[in-house]
Amino acid sequence: MTQMNVESFNLDHTKVKAPYIRLVGVTEGDKGDKIYKYDIRVKQPNQEHMDMPALHSLEHLMAENSRNHHDRIIDIGPMGCQTGFYLAVLNDDSYENILQVVENTLKDVLNATEVPACNEVQCGFAASHSLEGAQELARELLNKRNEWTEVF
């Protein structure tokens, strides 16, 4: 396989075992700050995917609630393949800390009564949401919490 610029294109998706959380890479800035990018894989690549309304709501819930557990979250966003999310954090090299942040955030999802910013003013596709779907995804991930560190 030819080496590509995008890290995930160099990952053999037939060998991974979802769910997992793995460090994708570290980017260091000119002043020494470091961005840690994580692959939060929810579904098994090429076998399963998240339905868009559930994925969209889980994105909103995780983006909003994760910042209650970590003050240096840069972004959390869905993968185009609908099998997971990317999480970027600033200057935190603790994998265990990130696992705890994700766990706490998913517990928040289970307790949510609404999807944040689920309206036409704050969201580009407000009609495509499912709180129940997001909560089911969170429940599935939490039920397999002991597997998150096993990528292959």
From Swiss-Prot:
Molecular function (Gene Ontology), one example: iron ion binding
Positions with a binding annotation for Fe cation: 56, 60, 123
Top-tier EC class: lyase
Annotated coiled-coil segments of the chain: none
UniProt-listed Enzyme Commission number(s): 4.4.1.21
Manner of cofactor binding, per the entry note: Binds 1 Fe cation per subunit.
GO biological process annotation, one example: quorum sensing
InterPro entries associated with the record: LuxS_sf, Metalloenz_LuxS/M16, S-ribosylhomocysteinase
Entries under Pfam families matching the protein: LuxS
Endpoints of the signal sequence: none
Protein known as: S-ribosylhomocysteine lyase
UniProt source species: Halobacillus halophilus (strain ATCC 35676 / DSM 2266 / JCM 20832 / KCTC 3685 / LMG 17431 / NBRC 102448 / NCIMB 2269) (Sporosarcina halophila)
